[in-house]
Design a protein with these regions (language model features):
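Conserved beta-strand segments of alpha/beta enzyme cores
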Residues: 26-28, 125-128
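A short, structured active-site edge motif that brings together acidic residues
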Residues: 33-36, 104-110, 130-137
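Glycine-rich phosphate/pyrophosphate-binding loop and the adjoining helix
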Residues: 128-158
Length: 158
């Protein structure tokens, strides 16, 4: 069985958790990237995507350099933007068929999960999910979720 970890990270929070997972699981890693990068100005991105506007935004993502058919398990990581998945992950889920894959999503947020997992489950068969809550100051890179919860999530994938 091969495992692929696919994630998008804007502020670095999701990458932090992806790296933690990668350190414990033998898996290939793909960082999803929009063709046209988002602004480096955090407030500008918040203003553009607030009020669930991200649901309506279609963006193009860079092509994956892997063949998804080669993987049995897919770990998906995304920040939560306005109670939902990011436009980057939404495009990935719309573009790639994950039928027959065991999918393990994790999210990062400051406490506002919303409908994120429900939206992911609308695209694929979720085996186990993990919500990693960070402090409200995204620059701190400090999560509040227990290491034990993260460990249990990782063990469920093994």
């Amino acid at each position: 069985m091969k495992t692929l970890l696919v994630y998008y990270s804007y502020t670095g929070q999701t990458k932090l958790i992806a790296d933690k997972i990668k350190s414990k699981i033998d898996c290939d890693v793909v960082e999803l990237k929009p063709v046209i990068p988002f602004s480096n100005d955090y407030q500008e991105v918040v203003d553009e995507y607030q009020n669930n506007e991200s649901d309506k935004k279609c963006i193009e993502i860079e092509e994956l350099n892997v063949n998804l058919d080669a993987y049995d398990k897919i770990i998906i990581g995304t920040p939560v933007w306005w109670y939902s998945i990011t436009p980057v992950l939404r495009e990935f889920l719309n573009k790639y068929d994950l039928s027959g894959k065991k999918v393990y999503p994790f999210t990062t947020n400051a406490g506002w999960l919303g409908r994120t997992f429900k939206e992911i489950k609308g695209h694929c068969d979720v085996k186990k999910e993990l919500n990693v809550q960070f402090t409200e100051d995204w620059r701190e890179h400090k999560y509040l979720t227990s290491d034990n919860e993260i460990k249990e999530f990782i063990e469920s994938i093994l």
